[in-house]
Every structure is written in structure tokens, then in C-alpha cells.
Amino acid sequence: MYAYIDGILVEKNPTFVVMDCQGIGYVLHVSLNTYSTLQQKQQRCRLFTHLQVKEDSHTLYGFSSKEERELFRLLISVSGVGASTAQMMLSAMSPSELIANIANGNAAALQAIKGIGGKTAQRILIELRDKVTKSDFTITQFEQTNNSNVRNEALGALVLLGFSKQNAEKAVDKIMKSSNGDISVENLIKESLKIL
């Protein structure tokens, strides 16, 4: 029903934002990925939207890109994946990383996300793998596959050095995010060791 909302950012929280558009305040639920791309309050911005209509509520979801919105729609098309779970997935990984993990059949990466069990991860892979590889997402997928390989190599090395996988993942993800994924395996390991 709504393609996007273009207005002034009035309130900004990690899970939702309020945008003023022509004197009407819209509450849009956002992922951490979208939250991190937003400007300061009182700045003009545009969020692409998805409206979810239920018997007892109408909920607007906001996305910083059409790609993220399309991925959200694909995720909620999977049986057992609701809007909250899809938002959690988009908060845990960037759309590019999520697409790469689905395209590469990486169930372990999906299961690392809170609320995603083994069966749900497998269902997501089965239902979305072909859709993701055949869609416009493929350009980003190639670019992100390198980042996933760098991440996985660094994780493997840190685990071999004796760090727990959970702590290693936190450190690696923090460094990957701060470097926008543009980092070599060696530097990723070095920077992660400083945090661990």
C-alpha cells in the first residue's frame, strides 16, 4: 500500500523510528541495520515500507533500501518466520551477509541468530536459496561471499588459538562492522585479538 515514506526523522530508537510526513507521525519498525544508516533527528530521510495488516493491528516496517525490504518479504514468506524473526535476522546480519549465507547454504550462520533453530534454518535455505540466487541479489552475493570467507577463516583461526566460538564471533563481527567488511584475514585476526 505504501512504497516509501519521505519525511523528517522525529524519534530514533534501535527498534523503531517516528517520521513526520506532512504533519502526520508514522511509527516504523526498523532493523539495527536500517537504524545504523539513519541520520540524526530532525533530518529528512526516506524509508521504504512494508505494511503488515492483522486483525488487531496495522504495523509499518521501514527499510533503508529496497533490497532489505525485498529480503524481509522473502523471509516472512517462509512458514514459521514472522515479522519479528525477520527483523531479528536483518538486525543480526547485513542484507548482503544474510543473502550470501542463504545462497551458500550456511545453516550454522542462520542458527547463530537468536530465535532461529535448526528446522527453521533448513526451511529458510530450502525455500529461499533458489529465489535469492535467481534474483537481483546475486551481484551483492558475490561481493559478500569474499567477506564471509574472510570472516570464516578468521573465526577458524581464533578458535584454533583457544578462544570460544561465541566470543570469537562477537569480536570478528564487531571488527567486520567497523571496517565495513573491507579487511584482510590477517588484519581481522589481529584486530580481534586486541578485543579478546
Give the ranges of each region predicted by the language model.
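Low-complexity, acidic/Ser/Thr- and charged residue-rich accessory regions of DNA metabolism proteins
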Residues: 101, 137-196
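Amphipathic, charged-and-aliphatic alpha-helical interface segments
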Residues: 58-63, 83-102, 123-136
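Amphipathic alpha-helical segments within well-ordered protein domains
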Residues: 72-76, 87-90, 107-111, 155-159, ...
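Conserved NTP-handling cores and scaffolds of large molecular machines
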Residues: 49, 79, 97, 132-136, ...
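Structure-specific DNA junction-binding interface
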Residues: 1-77, 182-196
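Conserved, well-folded catalytic cores of nucleic-acid-processing
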Residues: 78, 92, 104-105, 131-135, ...
